[in-house]
């Protein structure tokens, strides 16, 4: 089963009324209006959907959408 992390992030963000734009993956989450609590909520929902948990060291490195996508793609390898 292949999981498209970008699509899953967009789906969960939309369900939670978080406006995301995948056009520029390097924009910091803070600049998108996503505070640390919203980011953790989003991450936990993604973890629940795909059945994995990100290690703490990966969580601490997530600053933008690219980091978020890469973190999940890495644990799914």
Curated annotation (Swiss-Prot):
Pathway(s) annotated for this protein in UniProt: Lipid metabolism; fatty acid biosynthesis
Lipid biosynthesis is among the record's keywords: yes
Protein task: Carrier of the growing fatty acid chain in fatty acid biosynthesis.
GO terms of biological process kind: fatty acid biosynthetic process
Keywords, comma-separated and alphabetical: Fatty acid biosynthesis, Fatty acid metabolism, Lipid biosynthesis, Lipid metabolism, Phosphopantetheine, Phosphoprotein
Domain of life: Bacteria
Domain Carrier: residue ranges: 1-76
Matching InterPro entries: ACP-like_sf, PP-bd_ACP, Ppantetheine_attach_site
Descriptive protein name: Acyl carrier protein homolog
Post-translational modification (record): 4'-phosphopantetheine is transferred from CoA to a specific serine of the apo-ACP-like protein.
Presence of the UniProt keyword Acyltransferase in the record: no
One Pfam assignment: PP-binding
O-(pantetheine 4'-phosphoryl)serine modifications at: 36
Gene3D superfamilies: ACP-like
Species of provenance: Ureaplasma parvum serovar 3 (strain ATCC 700970)
């Amino acid at each position: 089963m292949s999981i498209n992390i970008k699509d899953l992030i967009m789906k969960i963000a939309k369900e939670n009324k978080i406006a995301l734009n995948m056009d520029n993956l390097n924009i910091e989450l803070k600049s998108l209006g996503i505070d640390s609590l919203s980011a953790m909520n989003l991450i936990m929902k993604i973890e629940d959907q795909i059945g994995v948990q990100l290690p703490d060291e990966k969580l601490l490195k997530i600053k933008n959408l690219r980091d978020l996508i890469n973190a999940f793609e890495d644990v799914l390898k």
